[in-house]
Amino acid sequence: MPKIVLNGVTVDFPFQPYKCQQEYMTKVLECLQQKVNGILESHTGTGKTLCLLCTTLAWREHLRDGISARKIAERVQGELFPDRALSSWGNAAAAAAGDPIACYTDIPKIIYASRTHSQLTQVINELRNTSYRPKVCVLGSREQLCIHPEVKKQESNHIQIHLCRKKVASRSCHFYNNVEEKSLEQELASPILDIEDLVKSGSKHRVCPYYLSRNLKQQADIIFMPYNYLLDAKSRRAHNIDLKGTVVIFDEAHNVEKMCEESASFDLTPHDLASGLDIIDQVLEEQTKTAQQGEPHPEFSADSTSPGLNMELEDIAKLKMILLRLEGAIDAVELPGDDSGVTKPGSYIFELFAEAQITFQTKVCILDSLDQIIQHLAGRAGVFTNTAGLQKLADIIQIVFSVDPSEGGPGSLAGLGALQSYKVHIHPDAGHRQTAQRSDAWSTTAARKRGKVLSYWCFSPGLSMRELVRQGVRSLILTSGTLAPVSSFALEMQIPFPVCLENPHIIDKHQIWVGVVPRGPDGAQLSSAFDRRFSEECLSSLGKALGNTARVVPCGLLIFFPSYPVMEKSLEFWRARDLARKMEALKPLFVEPRSKGSFSETISAYYARVAAPGSTGATFLAVCRGKASEGLDFSDTNGRGVIVTGLPYPPRMDPRVVLKMQFLDEMKGQGGAGGQFLSGQEWYRQQASRAVNQAIGRVIRHRQDYGAVFLCDHRFAFADARAQLPSWVRPHVRVYDNFGHVIRDVAQFFRVAERTMPAPAPRATAPSVREGEDAVREVKSPGPLFSTRKAKSLDLHVPSLKQRSSGSAAAGDPESSLCVEYEQEPIPARQRPRGLLAALEHSEQQAGSPGEEQAHSCSTLFLLSAKRPAEEPRGGRKKIRLVSHPEEPVAGAQTDRAKLYMVAVKQELSQANFATFTQALQDYKGSDDFAALAACLGPLFAEDPKKHSLLQGFYQFVRPHHKQQFEEVCIQLTGRGCGYRPEHSIPRRQPAQPVLDPTGRTAPDPKLTLSKAAAQQLDPREHLNQGRPHLSPRPPPTGDPGSHPQWRSGVPRAGKQGQRAVSAYLADARRALGSAGCSQLLAALRAYKQDDDLDKVLAVLAALTTAKPEDFPLLHRFSMFVRPHHKQRFSQTCTDLTGRPYPGMERPGPQEESLVVPPVLTHGAPQPGPSRSEKPGKTQSKISSLLRQRPAGTVGAGSEDAGPSQSPGPPHGPAASEWGEPHGRDIAGQQAAGAPGGPLSAGCVCQGCGAEDVVPFQCPACDFQRCQACWQRHLQASRMCPACHTASRKQSVTQVFWPEPQ
């Protein structure tokens, strides 16, 4: 690894750093060496995490080496180097400069904080890639680290805390008891462990990971923890975090401002107080009964391991009185009549709490009493032991009285914190109506009446920052990829930052394209302003803009909306106007859910769709400041484009936003803290710009990445809005007046990037999408969970995920076809169907009634497989992996969906309600009583609108004969259905009914194989080939199949001639089978197109076409629809069903000549014509042998019914080409290439030249027939038919497969 010397410190870096990385590390060292704070912005992809780790650890090693050198010099007392002064050794100069690091224990610890544990895990993985091996510790909560079964099952975090404390105090947790003994083991203390590794190691060694991490913290060189452990004073005390002399690094620091304010704020609702009073009443009643009986409670007897509740009844009663007084004091506040609430200064909180006797003097006793009661009830089961209200009250008291009187007193707190940084806001309880609806006889009076919410909001993140500095932090480093503008960010923190850096990006200008799109394709202005964002004109123009952009952006596309309501409303509008279907036809849509549970499933499905072979990509719809806007991997193909649909300003009328702006304006006007405050309007604009910058940061993730950014709001055209963008983006921004120019430039950008940039390396951790449709089926996201929100339900937003037909979806929409000329690969306005299956669908759509809706709704689960035909490349054969049991993956997916649904239900319901739910499900399974099931589900899910989606998701468990009733129940309870369709009422595992032929007899089994004796029973006089050209040419012996046009996609080309072939086949099928039979055939063919199951379609085909020998040609001609990998099976099945050789089979070799003609063909009258023995060297097919034995003027010797009635049916139109080849090849070219002259490789004798085994061609105006060679001579000589002298061309003559007598 390269070693770089920066500011006198040798940094061991994994690779040669870029210039911007060296600049970044230099600034980090400057902060560390000078003991100052720094704000460092460096975009994701520039390696800032690696730079931070290597620089800080190299600096620590430099300090350690200096101390070691000084100690060595002291021991030898300068004897080794007598001419060198002792002060020049080690860190003596630093000590003289005021940096007294004289021993190893004085070397500062590094505290590395990020927002989530998943981000910390990524940092630890980066640390493993370096050469440094420091002692590492990761701090987490009991919820993440506890492995005790009883504690883990508790749903509430604070219950886990108190139950754990109870077990630790009583020494009843054997995992905790092993900590002191095993914490020094090499396997636990030495390796670099993240949060998951810590849990695994703790489980393996049966030692508590939570307390193990606290022990490791004492000796750790670098400690990883989430933000709130540092910013929240209560958490700092709980984890015993000593900040004196430490270096604190906040990674992803763009969230620090919000976290600082939220950690010092609270909202106390009437429900919190009411639930706390309920618990105190319960404890008071329990302790009163115990005291009256004169016996200790059995749970707290002397032989019990629990310490019990060490409180007098009088103390419990006083605590209840305090809560009642606090509730009364809040209710006594007068509010204006418009329910807008009232705002008080920060100091008012002390007056309010003083009325309830909560002061600096009493807070310790009150907190101790609350803690005892909560711990006393910890671990108890039941719905009436919810101690969340008491725990919240304890947290609130700690926030309000966070400064001890001895450290500054109430006066100083009011002057510094409350008066300047806080506001008290009291407003009516907005959730009262839902609470009142759910209230019952067990609810308290306080919960049933409308109360008031007490809000205590901190508006200065600098308060928490100043507290960290006051704790003695050596250096505070804030770093992120999106801190711009850095100057204003520093003002908000309210502490000095002498070191600032806005690093440029490491990419070149040809790797990024940024455009402001103020207008859509139709010229309408794009705006997310409050008064225009829901207008029909704006939503329609935005939808068209997104659809056109999706055409030119390859692979993954990210679309960010200002908020969830805007995203949901937009999708609802696009669905109603059919715009969503058009977008879905280009790239499947994935929508970011609100809930955390289903988000991982959604993003995994998106990754899998983008990575799927042959995929056209996917679109992910997300929200600014949402889960997808930070921390996720959208590098390379996962995110080639980012579209920002508007400026995500905070809600302007929200009380907290209004008060924040007022607070900033007041502080700026007063010149507080040296005037270092933003104005309210500046802060308001920066909230939107920072969210936009975070979304833009998704597109470029590393040095070789590239992508495009679309800013689709006219306000981005203003200079002040562009000035808020990151410094590395601003030079590339271009404002467009014409939407067509946007598409043109973007298409050119991606063409150049794909040629100049290296292809992304295969992802080792990419979603596991194996080749084939069965693998795609495994990564489908669970349908029920996706329907939990309108925004997540793609069935609602996208009514059809069906493959587009031959006509372009945008054919009738001029605006949406605007960008066709700018696409990378021009696509005609009306594409011809690729393949005969698509041609059949096109033919059926043209035959349907006008206005008939051809597209059907698909579930979200079907999303990943419904688009498969559209994704296949135009060249080359289709790759379809055969699955022996197609039902098994579907069943597995259904099982996975059911499990995920049960997890979601368990998260939403209480333990008692979940037990009721599971019991109802078991009863329904046993009794099939739908009425009882509906009566049970209603109270569980219908009362809370947030649980309506769970009721609708239960649809998957309802039996088919009850699904329609369940749909009615859902509509009655929630106002929305659950996606019922009539076909859902058909049992899925119902055994297939035997198909009857027109005579009423049971059709033969499609898998029937005929013996020789059975084959002899068939009538040999009926020729099989009474239809049109239908056999695929045999594949070329060598070369790439994709290089031969006639073999593209494995089936004959489905251009104009292919459509004629399909239309002719359908016409013949209707004549032969009738309307009912033809409908059955079409239904089976559509099913085959979707599920690729040949057996199903053969069962229907055999029942319809094998009852009468004259229908055999329909069976053989069906081969035009059979996919290449099924051709051989189909030909063998045709032979088995008819007892006759399939016309497309290969000719038998010389060893098989004796088996060419079945014995049944030899008895009867002798057949005229030359025998095979006359041409011993000639190999013939079975059909050829039959034709050779039949002269042109007979139907068959020995036939009792020979006559005109057995002549073939009416002639049909030409095949894919008049010559059996693609247009442009003449007859001579076919013969030279050795291509068969049509479906038959041998035929009758030409009446002109006497050539044998030829297929005749007939004049369209008369019955004149000749072979290919004769026709070519005639047409070259006169271009007229020799018989009728009608002008003819080689394209007009028609192949004749059963020649008429001449």
Curated annotation (Swiss-Prot):
ATP binds at S42, H43, T44, G45, T46, G47, K48, T49. Residues 758-767 have a biased composition (Low complexity). Residues 758-819, 981-1006, 1019-1058, 1134-1153, 1160-1234 are annotated as: Disordered. One of its GO terms (biological process) is DNA recombination. Keywords: 4Fe-4S, ATP-binding, DNA damage, DNA repair, DNA-binding, Helicase, Hydrolase, Iron, Iron-sulfur, Isomerase, Metal-binding, Nucleotide-binding, Nucleus. It is found in: Nucleus. This is Regulator of telomere elongation helicase 1. It comes from Pongo abelii. The gene is RTEL1.
